[in-house]
Amino acid sequence: MADPWQECMDYAVILARQAGEMIREALKNKMDVMIKSSPADLVTVTDQKVEKMLMSSIKEKYPYHSFIGEESVASGEKTVFTEQPTWIIDPIDGTTNFVHRFPFVAVSIGFVVNKEMEFGVVYSCVEDKMYTGRKGKGAFCNGQKLRVSQQEDITKSLLVTELGSSRKPETLRIVLSNMERLCSIPIHGIRSVGTAAVNMCLVATGGADAYYEMGIHCWDMAGAGIIVIEAGGVLLDVTGGPFDLMSRRIIAASNIALAERIAKELEIIPLQRDDES
């Protein structure tokens, strides 16, 4: 039987490239920067333009599909997550990087049916790296097959995470104490590139052994989540329970043993779910 979603995925790759071109062009020009939920949560006109282009292109081709987009939600739309084929879009993952011209900026497109991730496309456009993952078909970067590391020993692991955009003292305390706890196990190190999607793709490549974060959103995870799984990795909730795309938290790891070991160390940040906002 023909893959019903392959055409959608091929289209997502074309659109991600177009969006990347818009972003690269915008990097040459002066930017108007606005603030969203905190002084460290930024948005630009380019975020909004790219999302508009992606949404209108997809809606024209697939009018009966559903959509969740970061900038649409920021402008007041509800996150409605149903069984319908749903495109989950982050037009610029790494807006702060974009504003500072720090070279990790990604377009993330996830596609979910019956609440299951079917495919993901993450285009790291400054690096010109196109990451793709299709349920049951593997994960690739620029056509090269991806495979997670086989590292199960946390003391030999390299982790990726972020400080996040919240500047609330209690949230920062938890974020930093979690890092301190993990570092003192000890582990080899912690890295951050400033975009959840690229952090997760680095786990898929085997370059990092695991990624964890709390406070991100479904549009940060939907594209890269399936890429990690298809590269042989696992997704887990930070409690060690099953991963939930609407929960705003994740451990993406090369294997279950490492994911569960990380979960043991984490103090949980209380968060409002995406589907409750």
Swiss-Prot record:
**What catalytic reaction does the record list?**
a myo-inositol phosphate + H2O = myo-inositol + phosphate; 1D-myo-inositol 1-phosphate + H2O = myo-inositol + phosphate; 1D-myo-inositol 2-phosphate + H2O = myo-inositol + phosphate; 1D-myo-inositol 3-phosphate + H2O = myo-inositol + phosphate
Metabolic or biological pathway, per its Swiss-Prot or TrEMBL entry: Polyol metabolism; myo-inositol biosynthesis; myo-inositol from D-glucose 6-phosphate: step 2/2
Coiled coil spans: none
Question: EC number(s)?
Answer: 3.1.3.25, 3.1.3.94
Top-level class of the enzyme under EC nomenclature: hydrolase
Annotated positions binding Mg(2+) 2: D90, D93, D220
Q: Name one GO molecular function term.
A: glucose-1-phosphatase activity
Q: Where does Mg(2+) 1 bind?
A: E70, D90, I92
Q: Which domain of life is it from?
A: Eukaryota
Annotated binding of substrate, by residue: E70, I92, D93, G94, T95, G194, T195, A196, E213, D220
GO cellular component terms, alphabetically, are: axon; cytoplasm; neuronal cell body
> For this UniProt entry, what is the primary localization, expressed as one broad class?
cytoplasm
Per UniProt, activity regulation is: Activity with myo-inositol monophosphate and D-galactose 1-phosphate is inhibited by Li(+), Ca(2+) and Mn(2+), but also by Mg(2+) at concentrations above 3 mM.
Places the protein is found? Cytoplasm
Q: Which GO terms describe its biological process?
A: inositol biosynthetic process; inositol metabolic process; phosphate-containing compound metabolic process; phosphatidylinositol biosynthetic process; phosphatidylinositol phosphate biosynthetic process; signal transduction
Subunit structure and binding partners: Homodimer.
Described by its record, this protein's role is as follows: Phosphatase involved in the dephosphorylation of myo-inositol monophosphate to generate myo-inositol. Is also able to dephosphorylate scyllo-inositol-phosphate, myo-inositol 1,4-diphosphate, scyllo-inositol-1,3-diphosphate and scyllo-inositol-1,4-diphosphate. Also dephosphorylates in vitro other sugar-phosphates including D-galactose-1-phosphate, glucose-1-phosphate, glucose-6-phosphate, fructose-1-phosphate, beta-glycerophosphate and 2'-AMP.
Q: Which family does it belong to?
A: Belongs to the inositol monophosphatase superfamily.
Protein name per UniProt: Inositol monophosphatase 1
Organism classification, top ranks? Answer: Eukaryota, Metazoa, Chordata, Craniata, Vertebrata
Q: In the UniProt record, what gene is named as encoding this protein? A: Impa1
